[in-house]
């Protein structure tokens, strides 16, 4: 199927990824990991909720953790729209499409609407959020990974093509993609609304499942310092994938798993993707440089493990192919 262009006159104006709502069995352990380890700021905590944000974020939160005794899960993926008028347009659009959608309330946010996307991912859109001065210029308080902002998420889905079509209709632009060699059979799509390469990635796999959240830091040295800081805090075993560089997006990265198993990427080096005549970059599925330009492949768990969305049934992927894993790589060396 040909690669379609994004809708340049979308029904409402989504501006960026806003926030992610995740589960936590122990909010104090979660706080230690994100605040003391990664260097995020806590903006609110009570017995059932923990709100955090990164150094450059003037809004109240980009991560919310809710006390939850069941299996680890993701409750919501949040996006920002330009203003409240766009929320009304969104509600009208989804009602017209007969996609269940409702207004709701969340602490520290303005009007919010909830719905599920075509992959079954629970979404919410808001236009406003409480604000206060960020820690950006309080350099003495920059610790851990010195994370600047929540940049993107990656989600595994059983049907990448349908997710791509759905988000393209909402104005998300394709910047890079993975396809089966010699075809446009989509295995992964990197989609954006803000200035750089992605707000959300949909990749082929059992889903819907949140693969990771990604926090941007301005320098490569911060990625390495984050690893050192986590080790000094006794959190070295939380590393999920060691430092390397992705071909797709050009990110220099490290991955951790938080106390509940949610995967977190700390990265730098994405590039701007702005001009209207820029074409998306294609990667063959067989080209392993898309995942790592150098270094070892990811371990098997990196490809198959993730965070389920609450009350959502997992579906087997429509496309089948075994990834090149660290275990496979080491076996060939033996």
Model-identified regions with their sequence ranges:
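Core segments of cupin and vicinal oxygen chelate
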Residues: 12, 18-59, 104-107, 114, ...
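Short, flexible, glycine/charge-rich loop motifs used to bind or transfer phosphoryl groups or to couple energy/partner
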Residues: 10-11, 67, 143-144, 203-204
